[in-house]
Regions:
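Periplasmic N-terminal accessory/gating domains of Gram-negative outer-membrane beta-barrel systems
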Residues: 78, 124-176, 184-202, 207-215, ...
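C-terminal beta-signal and adjacent terminal beta-strands/loops
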Residues: 274-276, 280, 666-676, 701-766
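Short, acidic, small-residue-rich periplasmic hinge/interaction motif at the N-terminus
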Residues: 38, 42-45, 81, 88-141, ...
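Gram-negative outer-membrane beta-barrel transporters
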Residues: 468, 473, 570-573, 592-675
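Transmembrane beta-barrel wall of Gram-negative outer-membrane proteins
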Residues: 248-273, 290-333, 353-371, 375-377, ...
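Outer membrane beta-barrel strand-and-loop segments of large Gram-negative receptors
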Residues: 406-410, 450-454, 458-462, 545, ...
Length: 766
C-alpha cells in the first residue's frame, strides 16, 4: 500500500511539469446574450467558438453565479438552447444546430429534473426517480471508482446493514426484491467478492435510473427498488480509451467507430488480480467475507477471482432508427483446499456466473410516434461443491446447484400527444426456468436432499400517461400480469401527482401496486459460506405464494438560495412472504410459514450547495414488521430489515483539480432472534444489536497533459477510526445426530464489520 501511495505522489509531481491551466472560472448571467457569454468563455479558457451568427444572436442565457468548468458551461449552453457544442480539438469548438429531438428526450422534459445535483455532481432527481451518471459522479465518501451500488447507498432510504454492495434494503424490502437491469438483461448476481463490490463496471459510459416509488408500469417482476442501467447508444467519432487500476482489479473501456456515424462498438473488461497479488484491501474483504468458516489465507493454490466483460454494438441505419446488441458476462470463482491431515483433504469449489444478451431496436415513425422492441436472455448459474477425501477410494461430498434462465421480449410504443402530454403503452412476455438441487453422496451412494424445477411464462400489458396542467403534473399508469403456469393474475395501478406551488416548493403524492413470483429463500445445509446460502425459487401459489405490495407515499421538495430540503413519507404492506426457518433438510412442508408485513417510514435530505463545496445530511425513520400465524403466537415482530433510525452527514470540497469528501454514517442496531440453552428459537427478532457507525474519507486529483489526455488518481479510506461493530447474529442449523433432523437445533454465529480499509485508484482517458 505504501508503494501505491508513493506512486500517486510521483504522478502528481510529474503533472506539475505539465500544463497548469486553470480548470474553473466564475460565471453568472441573467438573460444575457449568448454571443457575450461565448466571448467571455473564450477569454477565460483561451478557446475559440465558430458558429453561424443567425443561430446564436437570438439566444439568451442565464446561469447561477459560481465556478464552472468548460465542460459544465458547454453542457448548460446545450441544455438551455437548441444548440450543440462540438469539440474539434483542445482549443476549437463549433456551435451547431442540435439534432432533432426524439420522443424519448421529450418524455424526459415531462419528467422534469427537480434537483440538478443531488448529493453530488452526476446525480439528478426527477419527479419520479433518480438518474446517476457514474462517469460524471464526483467522489463520494469511502467509494472508489463510483461503484454503482455503493453510490446508491448514499441516497436516503437505501441501506446495506451487512456492509455489502449488493445487499440493498430499500424501504424495508430485501435485496431479492430489487430488479436490476443492464440494457434489459436481468441481473441475478450483481456482485463480486460475495457482494462486497458491484459487478457492473462503473467506468462504462452509462446512465442509472433508480426508482423507489411510483414506478413506471413498464417495470414489473419485483416489489422493491428498480435499478435500470443503460449504456450509451452514441456512436463516437474517434477511438476513446478509458483504463484504470485499483487495489482489487484492473479494467479497460474502449469506444470506437466502425462506420462513421453509422456503426460503433464499445467493449469493457474488468478482472481481479487476486490470484497473483493479495493487497491489504483484498485481505480486509477476505476477513470480512469468510468469518466463521474454515477458510484461511489465499495464495496460488487457494484462489478467489472474478471478472466481468461487456460489449455493445450500435447501428444507426438512418436518422429515425437505432439498433443495438448488448452482451454481458459476470463470473466469480472460488477454489480452496484445506489439508486436515496427511490422508485427508477438504476441498470447496464455487462458481457463480451471470450471462446475458439483449437486442434493442428503436424506430421513430413520425415526430409523435415511436416504437421500441427489446429481446433479452439471461442465465444465472450457481455451482457449489464441498468434498472431503479420506484416501484414494473414500470421500464424502455435498453439491448445491441453482440455475435461473430468464428470456423474453417487449414491444413498447410512445405517442407524444402534445408538448404537455405523452402516452406510453406496450406488451411483454417472458419465461422463467428455475431449478435447484442439493445432493449428498460418497463413493457408494448419492442422495438428493432437495430437487425442484419449475417454469412459468408471464404475459404483461401496460400503459402510462403523463399530463401537465400548468402547475400540476399527473402520471397515472396500469400494469396487468398473467402468470400462465399457476393461472394467476394481478392488476397493478400506479399514480404520481405533483403540484408546484412556486419556484421553491413542490408537493408530491404517489401510489403503486406491484407483484413478484421470483424470490430467494435461505437454506441451512452444509454450506460454509454464509453470504451465499440463498437460492432462487419460483412461486407455485402454494408453498411459495406470489408476493404483492401496495405503497403510498407523500412528500415535498423545497429549494431556495442553494438550500435543498427533500422529505418523503411512505407506507407499504406486503403479502405472500415466507419464513424458511428450518432449511431444505427438514422433513415436512409445515416448515415454510406464510405471512404478511408492513413498513412505514420517512426519508429526509437537507443539502447546502455553493460554488466550491457541498454539505448534506440524510435521516431515515423506519418501522418494518412481519406476521406469521405459526410463529411468535401470531403476533407481529420486527423484520430483518427493521433499522429504526439511520443518519449520515457528508461534506465535499473542491480546490481546482482536487476534490475531497468525507462522511459519517450511523444507524441503530438490527434486530436478532435468540436461542435457548437447548439450541431452539426462544424469541423472534426481539433483541437489538449495538448501534453501527463509521467515518469514511475520499480524495481525488485530476489533470491533463498537453495532448489533452486526462489522468485521475484517488484514495479512499473506509472506517477511518477502525471501529468494529457487531452487524449480524445468524442461526446455523446443527446436524449433530439423527434427532436434529426432527427437532431443529441451532448455534449462534456472530459477524462483525470491516475494519479500516484503504483503496487507491489510477485512471487515464485517452
Amino acid at each position: 500500500m505504501r508503494k501505491l501511495v508513493l506512486l500517486c505522489f510521483f504522478l502528481c509531481w510529474i503533472q506539475s511539469s505539465w500544463s497548469q491551466k486553470k480548470e474553473q472560472f466564475t460565471f453568472g448571467y441573467s438573460n444575457a446574450k449568448l454571443t457575450k457569454v461565448l466571448s467571455d468563455i473564450e477569454k477565460a479558457f483561451d478557446v475559440k467558438y465558430s458558429y453561424v451568427d443567425s443561430l446564436v444572436t437570438s439566444q439568451n442565457f442565464s446561469l447561477p453565479k459560481k465556478l464552472y468548468s468548460l465542460t459544465e458551461i458547454n453542457f448548460e449552453i446545450e441544455k438551455q438552447s437548441a444548440l450543440q457544442v462540438v469539440k474539434i480539438n483542445d482549443r476549437f469548438y463549433s456551435v451547431n444546430k442540435a439534432p432533432e429531438t426524439d420522443d424519448s428526450e421529450k418524455i424526459i422534459r415531462l419528467e422534469e429534473v427537480v434537483v440538478e445535483e443531488f448529493l453530488a455532481k452526476g446525480i439528478k432527481k426527477t419527479n419520479q426517480h433518480y438518474i446517476i451518471s457514474p462517469q460524471k459522479v464526483q467522489t463520494l465518501p469511502g467509494v472508489t471508482d463510483a461503484d454503482i451500488l455503493l453510490s446508491l447507498q448514499q441516497l436516503p432510504g437505501v441501506k446495506s446493514p451487512n456492509e455489502t454492495a449488493t445487499g440493498l434494503y430499500i424501504r424495508g424490502g430485501t435485496s431479492d426484491q430489487n430488479l436490476i437491469l443492464m440494457d434489459g438483461i436481468r441481473l441475478y448476481h450483481p456482485g463480486h467478492l460475495f457482494g462486497m463490490i458491484s459487478s457492473i463496471n462503473p467506468n462504462v459510459e452509462q446512465t442509472v435510473s433508480y426508482y423507489n416509488k411510483a414506478v413506471n408500469p413498464k417495470f414489473g417482476e419485483r416489489v422493491s427498488g428498480i435499478i435500470d442501467i443503460k449504456s450509451t447508444d452514441q456512436i463516437t467519432e474517434k477511438l476513446k480509451v478509458n483504463a484504470g487500476i485499483n487495489a482489487l482489479n484492473a479494467d479497460v473501456y474502449i469506444q470506437t467507430p466502425l462506420v462513421k456515424n453509422k456503426l460503433g462498438l464499445q467493449v469493457s473488461g474488468r478482472k481481479s488480480y487476486t490470484e497473483w497479488l493479495q493487497s491489504p484491501t483484498f485481505n480486509q474483504l477476505e476477513n470480512k467475507v469468510f468469518q466463521n468458516t474454515n477458510f484461511e489465507d489465499f495464495d496460488k493454490d487457494n484462489q478467489f477471482r472474478f471478472y466481468d466483460y461487456s460489449a455493445k454494438l450500435n447501428f444507426k441505419p438512418n436518422a429515425k432508427s437505432m439498433i443495438s446488441l448488448s452482451g454481458l458476462v459476470i463470473k466469480n470463482d472460488l477454489d480452496y483446499k484445506n489439508i486436515i491431515k496427511a490422508d485427508s483433504i477438504n476441498n470447496q469449489r464455487m462458481n457463480i456466473e451471470n450471462y446475458g444478451f439483449s437486442l434493442n431496436w428503436t424506430q421513430k415513425y413520425s415526430r409523435k410516434f415511436t416504437q421500441r422492441v427489446l429481446v433479452f436472455y439471461s442465465l444465472y448459474s450457481f455451482d457449489y461443491l464441498k468434498k472431503q477425501d479420506y484416501d484414494i477410494d473414500k470421500f464424502e461430498a455435498f453439491k448445491k446447484l441453482n440455475r435461473v434462465v430468464d428470456s423474453g421480449a417487449e414491444l413498447n410504443f410512445g405517442y407524444q400527444v402534445n408538448e404537455k402530454s405523452n402516452l406510453e403503452f406496450g406488451y411483454q412476455v417472458f419465461g422463467n426456468d428455475i431449478s435447484h438441487l442439493f445432493n449428498s453422496y460418497n463413493q457408494d451412494i448419492g442422495i438428493d436432499l432437495s430437487l425442484r424445477h419449475l417454469y412459468n411464462v408471464t404475459h404483461a400489458g401496460f400503459a402510462h400517461y403523463r399530463q401537465d396542467f400548468g402547475t400540476w403534473n399527473f402520471q397515472p399508469g396500469l400494469r396487468y400480469n398473467y402468470y400462465s403456469q399457476i393461472k394467476a393474475s394481478s392488476f397493478e395501478p400506479r399514480l404520481l401527482i405533483q403540484k408546484t406551488l412556486d419556484k421553491s416548493l413542490i408537493l408530491q403524492a404517489s401510489y403503486e401496486r406491484r407483484s413478484q413470483v421470483l424470490s430467494q429463500v435461505r437454506e441451512n445445509a452444509a454450506n460454509d459460506l454464509s453470504l451465499e446460502n440463498y437460492v432462487w425459487v419460483l412461486s407455485d401459489n402454494g408453498k411459495y405464494p406470489i408476493q404483492k405490495v401496495n405503497q403510498f407515499s407523500t412528500g415535498f421538495i423545497f429549494k431556495k438560495d442553494n438550500w435543498l430540503l427533500d422529505v418523503d413519507a411512505y407506507y407499504k404492506n406486503i403479502t405472500g412472504i415466507t419464513s424458511f426457518t428450518l432449511g431444505f433438510l427438514g422433513q415436512n412442508d409445515n416448515e415454510i410459514h406464510h405471512g404478511q408485513g408492513f413498513t412505514k417510514g420517512v426519508d429526509v435530505l437537507i443539502q447546502k450547495s455553493v460554488a466550491s463545496w457541498r454539505a448534506w445530511m440524510t435521516y431515515t425513520y423506519q418501522d418494518s414488521q412481519n406476521q406469521f400465524e405459526a410463529l411468535n403466537d401470531g403476533d407481529y415482530f420486527s423484520s430483518n430489515a427493521d433499522i429504526k433510525h439511520s443518519f449520515n452527514v457528508a461534506f465535499n470540497k473542491k480546490w481546482d483539480n482536487f476534490l475531497f469528501t468525507t462522511g459519517w454514517f450511523w444507524h441503530s442496531g438490527k434486530p436478532f432472534s435468540t436461542i435457548n440453552d437447548s439450541g431452539e428459537i426462544a424469541s423472534y427478532n426481539a433483541e437489538r444489536l449495538p448501534d453501527y457507525h463509521r467515518l469514511d474519507i475520499s480524495g481525488s486529483y485530476q489533470f491533463q497533459n498537453p495532448k489533452g489526455n486526462t489522468f485521475k488518481i484517488g484514495v479512499s479510506i473506509y472506517n477511518v477510526y477502525n471501529h468494529k461493530d457487531l452487524i449480524s447474529k445468524e442461526f446455523e442449523r446443527k446436524y449433530s445426530d439423527v434427532s436434529d433432523f426432527i427437532t431443529p437445533r441451532y448455534t449462534m454465529q456472530n459477524y462483525y464489520t470491516l475494519g479500516i480499509m484503504h483503496n487507491i485508484f489510477f485512471r487515464v482517458n485517452l
